[in-house]
């Protein structure tokens, strides 16, 4: 990777903070490129004896083209390259938030010569190309911005701090050491002592196992990044909406004794033990002639198909019914499910204890009361355990999907290297797949990657990052 700034013909600009009408006291317009300082000086009027010095905050006003109207009162910060996020000259204009002020400031900036609107992720892409970040750090910044829980943010910060880069670079260097041993034998075998093939293969096996473990850990980490969708299903009036309100701690669904009150799919986002969870309260599934209720039931089936786990709620006061059994049969076999008996507060403890033998031979996972909260913690624990989310809590690093795919490719290439050794093929056959493994790991950190691939990666980032 390059350590000095790559010259770019154009200076780019974008709003680097979230913008919503009436929200946010401060917004930041960011510029990066050779004309950043010139543009900053052109659009911001600095009173008094303040000097444009790198990494010093100045006070001023963004003026309109005539120089007579003040668009906004701002603070402006110049960061000369390479001591900036992108490695280029960067100017940040800190203006008032909301919508109109920041929009007018950005329009004023974009009206200057040699400035264009930044593409999604272009600031981060320039930081990578200029050696200010490696690719895993840039991706981790994007994940930090998108984090939906404290635990996901902590995991992303490990990547921002270089945790993934150090782990992958270490594995890659170990493979490079083994490749150099093999290539030396290919070219100068007669001049070197015999290669300890067993030791080399043992090292390759160790690296392969570490890569496979990283991939396995990453799958658990996906739960923290993407969250889980939990579908609450059951007959009408078994307490699904009450359970949703209990878990989300706010009144999201209308709760009455009238069957069929929920006629659509309701959602509530919560965080349980660091895992973002979307609770989906489905309309009670039953045979109905009501067209509106049937529409809600159809959407319930769609929500069930998209869920990570189904929580089938039934009424303990009525016991397990044929309708409950019919609903259970509609849950896909490959979808994890929990059987939850609600209204435990209405039943004697002896009766609820015996129900585990009454559900078609299937054990009731949790017995609770959505009204009193009895059994709530047991349900949370069961949901996290069923989805494998509990195992994600101790993760130190977690690769994203792109990184997972490349790590898996590297592990497969190492397996092929081991097969070549088992077949007693010449050294140069060993090196083919070993180079593939090294190249795949280089793609993870950005050391071996094309600009076209970078464009595709950063196009998924938000504008201004």
UniProtKB/Swiss-Prot annotation:
One of its GO terms (biological process) is tRNA methylation. InterPro entries: G_TrmE, GTP-bd, GTP-bd_TrmE_N, GTPase_MnmE, MnmE_dom2, MnmE_helical, P-loop_NTPase, Small_GTP-bd. It comes from the Bacteria. It holds the Pfam family MMR_HSR1. Mg(2+) binds at residues 241, 262. It is an enzyme of class 3 (hydrolase). Its main location: cytoplasm. GO terms for molecular function: GTP binding; GTPase activity; metal ion binding. GTP binds at residues 237-242, 256-262, 281-284, 342-345. PANTHER family: TRNA MODIFICATION GTPASE GTPBP3, TRNA MODIFICATION GTPASE GTPBP3, MITOCHONDRIAL. Exhibits a very high intrinsic GTPase hydrolysis rate. Involved in the addition of a carboxymethylaminomethyl (cmnm) group at the wobble position (U34) of certain tRNAs, forming tRNA-cmnm(5)s(2)U34. This is tRNA modification GTPase MnmE. It comes from Prochlorococcus marinus (strain MIT 9303).
